[in-house]
UniProtKB/Swiss-Prot annotation:
GO cellular component, one term: cytoplasm
Keyword Transport: yes
Keywords per UniProt: Cytoplasm, Disulfide bond, Electron transport, Redox-active center, Transport
Top-level taxonomic group: Eukaryota
Site feature Contributes to redox potential value, where: G41, P42
Name of the protein described by the UniProt record: Thioredoxin H-type
Domain Thioredoxin: 2-114
Keyword tRNA-binding annotated: no
Cell location: Cytoplasm
Catalytic residues (UniProt): C40 (nucleophile), C43 (nucleophile)
Site location (Deprotonates C-terminal active site Cys): D34
Length: 118
């Protein structure tokens, strides 16, 4: 079972990750995945900003994956540094932002929301 963290859904097991990914794919909406780590300073810096975005954008699915907790998932998605944000639609990677870059994160979400099927 995934824990709700504001509107950012923390995936703490591979099962929860797969379940949330499937739910997001079923909605055909934008999924933003935050690959993070508890020891990562920039990750802690960007987390409140991500939570704010999640509150403002209820039609976007925000997921959070701790790379140390779900090493296999991080490896499958070729995550090399944190934070890494993946933008998915219907199971496909549409974009990626590496680093705690608020502006780039916001712009990338806006860009993909504009192309989202309604």
């Amino acid at each position: 079972m995934a824990a709700e963290e504001g509107q950012v859904i923390g995936c703490h097991t591979v099962e929860a990750w797969n379940e949330q990914l499937q739910k997001g794919n079923d909605t055909k909406g934008l999924i933003v995945v935050d690959f993070t780590a508890s020891w990562c300073g920039p990750c802690r810096f960007i987390a409140p900003f991500l939570a704010e975005l999640a509150k403002k954008l209820p039609n976007v699915t925000f997921l959070k994956v701790d790379v140390d907790e779900l090493k296999t998932v991080a490896h499958e998605w070729a995550v090399e540094s944190m934070p890494t944000f993946m933008f998915l639609k219907e199971g496909k990677i549409m974009d990626k932002v590496v680093g705690a870059k608020k502006d780039e994160l916001q712009q990338t979400i806006a860009k993909h929301m504009a192309t989202a099927s309604t």
